[in-house]
Amino acid sequence: MTVRVRIAPSPTGNLHIGTARTAVFNWLFARHHGGTFILRIEDTDLERSRPEYTENIMTGLRWLGLNWDEGPFFQSQRLDLYQKAVKQLLDQGLAYRCYTTSEELEALREGQKAKGEAPRYDNRHRHLTPEQEAEFKAQGRSFVIRFKIDDEREIVWNDLVRGKMSWRGSDLGGDMVIARASENDTGQPLYNFVVVIDDIDMQISHVIRGEDHIANTAKQILLYEAFGAKIPEFAHTPLILNMEGRKLSKRDGVTSISDFKQMGFTSEGLVNYMTLLGWSPPDSTQEIFTLEAAAKEFTFERVNKAGAKFDWAKLDWLNSQYIHNTPVDQLTDLLIPYWEAAGYSLAGGRDRPWLEQLVGLLSASLTRLTDAVDMSKLFFTETVELSEEGSKQLQQEGSKAVLEAIIAALETQAQLTETAAQDIIKQVVKGQNVKKGLVMRSLRVALTGDVHGPDLIQSWLLLNQIGLDKPRLNQAIAVS
């Protein structure tokens, strides 16, 4: 079998983490089998679909490394195909025009609710006579088109994740609406219908999507049969849950891929984490995967049925591993946009070699790329604010004299090197007859504003290169 899969997001919002995880599983399955990964944009909801969301979806997939082989195909450009399919079902007597009003449907639901029954359409317009239909039209009623569902029919399929699945037609809520009211005789085709037409037309072999689509699958199998088409294999993957076990939603904070990027997650770290959201590798001790490596191992036998809890701590850890193993030049490229977004100026001697030195200093401490913004602030501002501990340090006996001695020693240096910096510290310790700790703490506070921070000597060298060490030493002396 030639494997052909698709990811089919709706451009009614930015690329969601759940959609992205589904895309990951589709991509992995396609690559594992040497198949084709197709991008289809399901934009039949013309009122809510936006081109900016389409762009966000495509940009997000590319950023994650999920490049597609065919597409993007837009449902809004395929309406003729869907309308012909609706007409075919009408002509075959498998679908009909339903003129039931919204008020009548609401009354039906209320009556069923009062009896403790599940809401369902009662198929009242399935057998309208031409005269009845003409009367409804004369009343100005609009229609929807419904596909006939046999209540006695049992729908069975072997789900690649969940095993045997079985639904009865009576569980599907009555005859299914496949097109809503519009100006033409075939209506405006709806999601559950058009996805089947697309999957048939694109020869999709496997439909891989979230478990919240299981009820849709039962309905769609009936549509495949109505068109005499081959039914694809289905794999319904677990939902992504929050740590309390509820479906991950906007109430839990960030849910779109562009937000994760803005928060400082790397594409590699995020896609690695999504790969493990519901799938277990053969080697349970292996947690770091490239997409290509995961594709070699990916099977649905190792996809869990239970929901996958979204663990921020695990994502942070994975992300940090990718950051720590990214070469300095590449990491610099990743960090520059975050510095620019924070308004940091890269002028004043902050050239590429200087930036790479800064990245080398900070990289081991980064969990997210955004961490570099706060950690590096002292290297992009003319002055620093003293912390409470820093202020106390500068008031200690001997701090002012130590800083004055460092300034004097700096005047003898044409260029500060690591060796020269170490020599100055030794010279001040000896000359002032103080402990090295006092010198190091006083110097750190003067340069960084705090008693804690990145490597002191490397920080000093970076500040010296852009001419900020002496002004800060003088400012610290003034308040000591």
Swiss-Prot record:
GO terms for biological process: glutamyl-tRNA aminoacylation. A motif ('HIGH' region) lies at residues 9-19. It is an enzyme of class 6 (ligase). It holds the Pfam family tRNA-synt_1c. Transmembrane segments: none annotated. GO terms for molecular function: ATP binding; glutamate-tRNA ligase activity; tRNA binding; zinc ion binding. It is found in: Cytoplasm. Its main location: cytoplasm. ATP binds at K250. A motif ('KMSKS' region) lies at residues 247-251. InterPro entries: aa-tRNA-synth_I_cd-bd (IPR045462), aa-tRNA-synth_I_codon-bd_sub2 (IPR020751), aa-tRNA-synth_I_CS (IPR001412), aa_tRNA-synth_I_cd-bd_sf (IPR008925), Glu-tRNA-ligase_bac/mito (IPR004527), Glu-tRNA-synth_I_codon-bd_sub1 (IPR020752), Glu/Gln-tRNA-synth (IPR000924), Glu/Gln-tRNA-synth_Ib_cat-dom (IPR020058). Its EC number is 6.1.1.17. Keywords: Aminoacyl-tRNA synthetase, ATP-binding, Cytoplasm, Ligase, Nucleotide-binding, Protein biosynthesis. CDD domains: GluRS_core (cd00808). It catalyses: tRNA(Glu) + L-glutamate + ATP = L-glutamyl-tRNA(Glu) + AMP + diphosphate. GO terms for cellular component: cytosol. PANTHER family: GLUTAMATE--TRNA LIGASE (PTHR43311), GLUTAMATE--TRNA LIGASE, MITOCHONDRIAL-RELATED (PTHR43311:SF2). Belongs to the class-I aminoacyl-tRNA synthetase family. Glutamate--tRNA ligase type 1 subfamily. NCBIfam families: gltX_bact (TIGR00464). Monomer. Catalyzes the attachment of glutamate to tRNA(Glu) in a two-step reaction: glutamate is first activated by ATP to form Glu-AMP and then transferred to the acceptor end of tRNA(Glu). This is Glutamate--tRNA ligase. The lineage of its organism: Bacteria, Bacillati, Cyanobacteriota, Cyanophyceae, Nostocales.
